[in-house]
């Protein structure tokens, strides 16, 4: 079959968009030369980062947000619990103790539901505020243990003791022993270049189900500042045991009970990671962090607060699955793999520094491919040498300065209100030392998600997106001249319009796992 090519100039390109004139020079000066449309659409930045030409790479630890590394430091609040439980030095008590800094769950839920009924007249939230019985059934299905698992969970995964619907890797940070390991417990180390190792992990992680991947150099002092100062060892309930072992996989041990309070995370020379009542140690020989994100089902996401919750919880369950599979893969190569879904540090922070996205107005990261409809980055700390991936500039951070869609739909008013980024949010639970967008997370509730759903970048990569949408991304990445115009077009065309209407979703044959293959 012959491939059709049509030669077209940049000016003709922009004329087709109706944008010829001011700003052409800005785009032309920074864009590479393409002979035809096919070359532009199919081009990639390089072999290790499957990103299009307009996603520009920056220097390591120099993202589009401005960071003052003299001020920026490790966050004292662990697992984001500072938002829910009071001052950063407060001991871990329970997930229910959130009244110190945010209203109770029921009160907040009523507030969110009232706002949605006002925004969507005639909508009936049903028994639990998600819609009809089908919506509740879908949510129930994805928040239960895996089929046939009973109360103890299934295989490598198990429900959180006090967080219904969320799963963790039940063998803890190190993963379980493996039946195919050599009898003596030793595994020869895989020998590969850091670049080849990254490509290998990317292939494996995407096969397991990851959406995007990245890597960071933990040996860099700046990278260490992304790790929490303290945490509760393991993502388990307080006072429980966890079986962990070294990279040989056969030599598993029963370690002490998990402390019921946060302990410092320290970097020390050690053969294995360990913890006790005084500290938790990460071996300094573990100099790489492999990261991955998972996209959320876009059509579910648009039905904010309805069946959208099922899409969100599906991703949390998959985090445990994909993360543990990546962990096991690295272990059988003969290396340590310390997997902790949310415990190493703020997820959006890693996504911003590892080149998978840029910080957006919501304070969370916007993925260059999946937009705001993604979760991560998940992190696996390892001594396998991995080439780090640099931060990117795709124009998204700048775009958010003139796009207020997520701010306008936010029920709690927590999304960054000012036009420009700021150094200080005034909230003690936000990390200081960077010029970025600040969100008051204390008002958020898991029955919402409007900011993610309404983000224009979430829908620019859908299957039914036209060639124009791909060009829009290229223009946004190279000039800010048309940002306001594109925002107005987004509002007019309604790609990210929110809805509480679920009936059509039940009648349509959706893509596998709800992910649009166009992404």
Swiss-Prot record:
Cell compartments where the protein resides: Cell membrane
The record's free-text note on cofactor binding: Binds 2 [4Fe-4S] clusters.
An example Gene Ontology CC term for this record: plasma membrane
InterPro entries in the record: 4Fe4S_Fe-S-bd, RDH, RDH_dom, TAT_signal, TAT_signal_bac_arc
GO molecular function (one): metal ion binding
Mod. after translation: Predicted to be exported by the Tat system. The position of the signal peptide cleavage has been experimentally proven.
Description of what induces expression: Cotranscribed with vcrB and vcrC.
Family: Belongs to the PceA family.
Chain's role: Catalyzes the reductive dechlorination of chloroethene (or vinyl chloride, VC) to ethene. Can also reduce all dichloroethene (DCE) isomers, but not tetrachloroethene (PCE) or trichloroethene (TCE), at high rates. Reduced methyl viologen can act as the artificial electron donor.
Name of the protein: Chloroethene reductive dehalogenase
Species assigned in the record: Dehalococcoides mccartyi (strain VS)
Higher taxonomy: Bacteria, Bacillati, Chloroflexota, Dehalococcoidia, Dehalococcoidales
